[in-house]
Curated annotation (Swiss-Prot):
Annotated spans, Transactivation: 334-410
Residues in the DNA-binding region annotation: 16-85
Source taxon at top rank: Eukaryota
Region (Dimerization): 86-181
Family designation: Belongs to the E2F/DP family.
Positions of short motif HCFC1-binding-motif (HBM): 386-389
Gene of this entry: E2f4
Record-given protein name: Transcription factor E2F4
Length: 410
């Protein structure tokens, strides 16, 4: 048997075993992958760059790297690097990570302490508010506020929402500063309240800003009228009935309350007249006891009764009235009194009821309306309905234009 001779050396240009190893190919592939843009590498381009004839070896490398989580497949022949770059696994980063974890633990411990203190404070507030002895003292009096600001003037301001407040710089005059507060509201009035410092003093008064003109002027002195003399009672006489039937109203008699305020006793209005008195002025009162003003008490007449005027009805009513006598249920109407027995009216009252006078002064009208003689006022017209105020007025028109009321020059 012949012995084998020595093996011939490989031809020049043939790669060595080390150069064909899988470890060296993996190192070159990872370096190429890290140099790729955004870590994305095409496997065909990598095989051409590394001069790998068998792509099977490239696929073996990508399968191992994908298994340990360093790369991921983007498409069939494209992969992307996921691992950290060089210099990331240093000692400084590890120490920084340990420091951040310790800081997180400390912050969590402080958060737990704050939560515990919050629970304690809430429980303390609940204990104070729910205490029976403290519930009756849950307020502050104005004495407590004044005690805190002794020697100062306290003003309580109540203003609507949206009020603007301006406090200019105080100006010093002779060593004293002058403070000013400017309040402006577009939605409603502003009320300024002076806080009472003494409990025994009068209650505070709310004054609007600016104060009205009537508060700046002193109120007029009220004069008390002198006591009136007691009137004398007169005997009523029989009067002739009117020439035509009329709807009459009973003569008003003052109540006990009003009479007691004027003359301290009750009295009646006596009417006297003569049979020959005309019916034209039959509604006037002959005498005015207790200082009352002369009122026009003419009875109401219907238009139908005024048209049917006959002398026969007048004579028949006169005979029946004289035969039957006065009926207590019948309402007698006042007639004109004897001119000799009429009291002279004062000058003021005669000027008031003068028919030739155009109008009365506003002061005299207010005085009459405030007296007890003309109060209370009775509404003669029906109450306003839903269709009474359905008209609109221009900016240049007023209430007088709506109701056709002439403007009086008082």
């Amino acid at each position: 048997m012949a012995e084998a001779g020595p093996q011939a050396p490989p031809p020049p240009g043939t790669p060595s075993r080390h150069e064909k190893s899988l470890g060296l190919l993996t190192t070159k592939f990872v370096s190429l992958l890290q140099e790729a843009k955004d870590g994305v590498l095409d496997l065909k381009l990598a095989a051409d760059t590394l001069a790998v004839r068998q792509k099977r070896r490239i696929y073996d490398i990508t399968n191992v790297l994908e298994g340990i989580g360093l790369i991921e497949k983007k498409s069939k022949n494209s992969i992307q690097w996921k691992g950290v770059g060089p210099g990331c696994n240093t000692r400084e980063i590890a120490d920084k990570l340990i420091e951040l974890k310790a800081e997180i633990e400390e912050l969590q411990q402080r958060e737990q302490e704050l939560d515990q203190h919050k629970v304690w404070v809430q429980q303390s507030i609940r204990n104070v508010t729910e205490d029976v002895q403290n519930s009756c003292l849950a307020y502050v009096t104005h004495e407590d506020i004044c005690r805190c600001f002794a020697g100062d003037t306290l003003l309580a301001i109540r203003a609507p929402s949206g009020t603007s407040l301006e406090v200019p710089i105080p100006e010093g005059l002779n060593g004293q500063k002058k403070y000013q507060i400017h309040l402006k509201s577009m939605s409603g009035p502003i009320e300024v309240l002076l806080v009472n410092k003494e409990a025994w003093s009068s209650p505070p008064v709310a004054v609007p800003v600016p104060p009205p003109d009537d508060l700046l002027q002193s109120p007029p002195a009220v004069s008390t009228p002198p006591p009136l003399p007691k009137p004398a009672l007169a005997q009523p006489q029989e009067s002739s009935p009117p020439s035509s039937p009329q709807l009459t109203t009973p003569t008003p008699v003052l109540g006990s309350t009003q009479v007691s305020e004027v003359a301290c006793q009750t009295s009646e209005i006596a009417v006297s007249g003569s049979p020959g008195t005309e019916n034209k002025d039959s509604g006037e009162v002959s005498s005015l006891p207790l200082g009352l003003t002369a009122l026009d008490t003419r009875p109401l007449q219907s238009s139908a009764l005024l048209d049917s005027s006959s002398s026969s009805s007048s004579s028949s009513s006169s005979s029946s009235s004289s035969s039957s006598g006065p009926n207590p249920s019948t309402s007698f109407e006042p007639i004109k009194a004897d001119p000799t027995g009429v009291l002279d009216l004062p000058k003021e009252l005669s000027e008031i009821f003068d028919p030739t006078r155009e109008c009365m002064s506003s002061e005299l009208l207010e005085e009459l309306m405030s007296s007890e003689v003309f109060a209370p006022l009775l509404r003669l017209s029906p109450p306003p309905g839903d269709h009474d105020y359905i008209y609109n007025l221009d900016e240049s028109e007023g209430v007088c234009d709506l109701f056709d009321v002439p403007v009086l020059k008082l």
